[in-house]
Each structure stands twice: as C-alpha cells, then as structure tokens.
Amino acid sequence: MDVLSVSEINAQIKALLEATFLQVRVQGEVSNLTIHKVSGHAYFSLKDSQSVIRCVLFKGNANRLKFALKEGQEMVVFGGISVYVPRGDYQINCFEIEPKEIGSLTLALEQLKEKLRLKGYFDKENKLPKPHFPKRVAVITSQNSAAWADMQKIASKRWPICELVCINTLMQGEGCVQSVVESIAYADSFHDTRNAFDAIVVARGGGSMEDLYSFNDEKIADALYLAKTFSMSAIGHESDFLLSDLVADLRASTPSNAMEILLPSSDEWLQRLDGFNVKLHRSFKILLHQKKAHLEHLADFLKRLSFENKHHLNALKLEQLKIALENKTLEFLRFKKTLLEKISTQALTSPFLQTKTERLNRLENALKLAHANLKLPQFGAFLSKNNQAIELEALKAGDKIELSNEKARASAEILSVDRV
C-alpha cells in the first residue's frame, strides 16, 4: 500500500466526496450563524440531536432568499459537499434553503408581518377615520378591469355625487409593485389641496395567489402606511387576505364591497332626512309654544314690576319730603322759641311783639296745614275751622268748616259726628 501525504489524502477525499455528494438535501436546525457584512456570505452549522455539519451560503444564493435566516430555524438545505483541502474540512455549499414544513414565501411573509407589527403598521390608533360623505375618491386599478366597471356602477347608484377617479395601474406581474406604489403616492400628493381625494382605494378582482402576492410586498405596505389620505384595500375575494389588507386603514372583501362600505346610500339618507324633517317640525312647534308662553309671562311680570316700582318710588319721594318738612318746621320753631326767650318781659307787652306773636301763630297754623297736606289722599281735601287745621275726630255737630285743595275751596256745616 502506497504511503500518502496529508495533502494527497485530503485531495482524494475531496474528489470522492464532491463527486459522490454532488447534490444533497439535508434537514437540521440553524446554529452558529454568521453573516459577513462585507462579503455578504453566510456561514452556519446545521445540527440535529446527535451531529453537526458546517454550511456556507454565498452572497449570490443568499440574495435569492425571500426570508431572513435566523438562529434556531428548522431548515432544509439543498446543495453539494465541498472539501477545504488545507484543513481537511468539509461543508455543505448551499444553493437553496427552505423552511421545514412551510414554504419560504410563507415564512418570509410571517417575518415581514412581525417586522411591520413592531413598527406599528397594524395598530388601530394609527388608522385614519373613514370619511362620512366622500366627494372624490381615487381608485387604483386597471381602467379596463371588471373591478373598475363594477365599482362605477355601484357608486352611481349609492352616492352619485361622488367623483370616482381611476388611476390606471398595473395590478399583477412584473412591475406591479412599483406601479401600485407610484399610484398611491400620486393620489396622496393631492392631500391638503383643492383637488384632494377623500379616500384612496386599491382594488383588483380575484386571481391565483401568485397573481395577488404582489400585495404582500413591503413597498406597498410602506406606501399605504405613509399615506396621509384614508386608504382601503380591496384585493381579490372574501377568502383572500393580504398584507395590504392589514396595513390599509380599512379592508373590503371585494372591489364592489369597497364601494358599499365607503359610500353612503342616498336612498337611506333621503328617508333619514324625511324623518329628521318631521321631528324638527314637531320640536319647533313645541319650542315655539313654550317660548310664546314664556314671553307672555314675562310681559305680565314687567307690567306689574313697572307699576309697583313707580308707586314705590313716588311713595319714597313723598316720605322724604315729609321728613324734610318736619325737620325744617321743628328747626324753625326752635329758633323762634329761642328768640322769644331772649326778649325781656317788658317787651312782651309791646305792640310790635304782639304783632309778631300773631304772625307766628298764623305761620304755625299754616305749617300744620302744610303738614296735613302731606297726608292728603289722592282725592281728599284739607279740613279747617276758623282758618285753623282741625282733625276730623275733633269736630262736633253744628261746627262750620272749610274744605280746600289745590283746585277749590268749600264751606260746610257738620250735621253729626259718629265716633269709630
């Protein structure tokens, strides 16, 4: 048996293994994952409960993965055995990698959903409210599609005053994602302008999952989330549920259903308005009756208030005049009394003083009459006897009296007096 060098035996092993295991499919759990930022190559191990094998995924193949490779994932790798002669190491050179039990597209979608969920794309608080009465709606679809025709038909019946604007868009195949993203951005560019759209509806009819899968793309999700205009996703049929349905502000099961959800029914609103009119008329009549009664009550109150207030003011003025006159009278009498006390006893018999005394008595009687005048009722008269004021209760039968007021004077004789 020939003696081989280390290099020779490794070279023979390389030739044998690479020829024998040209294509293999191996299942295991991903561990020790390292992705080189510069080269883009991924290095990892695939293990089961008893053994481990190293793997490499070069950049070209890594770029074709639709999902992110992570530690702990159960994967099936497809590739060939390669041997590194200088170290005698062997590994699987991976051409493709698929998740165990589920497809790579499904895993990629689940990973994208989780990513967007963490960014808040599905949160209710980030959803815009549906407009109540849309006047202008942008429909992102193919202008030759049955979906567009159905949407126009339903809109014209439900809410004919709404203007539907079709933004012709490629809705499947290569270039679909970019076309949809550009159409969303175009419709949203009118936000806060005179020609702004009240809603953006992304719509297309049913199809295979391959036809609809473009609407699971992250770029479309970003465009819907970042739009400042209310958005709806109406892709496929009721059973089709896509990423755009989760990100849009509202989902409709079909394009036709989108119009039924978005647009109010004019017939229903006409019936409501009729009902509102009846209720408003009834409420107005009740309110008018209440206000009329209130005004009548207020008018009566103001009349009473005006009379009572005027009477109160007049009485107050009269009382003030009475008090003022009494004060002046007392002051005058005190003055005269003081003056008389200063006159000597001899002067009391003088004709001059007698004249003044008589004048003072007349003045006192006049003041009493004036004082009585303050108490005179509205239709009464002054009562005097011998030019002196006298109280009614002081009269007796046969007295001759004078009655006077501002307008007239009269003489009378008392026939009888009844004491109360």
UniProtKB/Swiss-Prot annotation:
It is found in: Cytoplasm. The keyword Chaperone does not apply. Its EC number is 3.1.11.6. Signal peptide: none annotated. It is an enzyme of class 3 (hydrolase). GO terms for cellular component: cytoplasm; exodeoxyribonuclease VII complex. One of its GO terms (biological process) is DNA catabolic process. Pfam families: Exonuc_VII_L (PF02601), tRNA_anti_2 (PF13742). Keywords: Cytoplasm, Exonuclease, Hydrolase, Nuclease. One of its GO terms (molecular function) is exodeoxyribonuclease VII activity. It catalyses: Exonucleolytic cleavage in either 5'- to 3'- or 3'- to 5'-direction to yield nucleoside 5'-phosphates. Belongs to the XseA family. Bidirectionally degrades single-stranded DNA into large acid-insoluble oligonucleotides, which are then degraded further into small acid-soluble oligonucleotides. Heterooligomer composed of large and small subunits. HAMAP family: Exonuc_7_L. This is Exodeoxyribonuclease 7 large subunit. The lineage of its organism: Bacteria, Pseudomonadati, Campylobacterota, Epsilonproteobacteria, Campylobacterales.
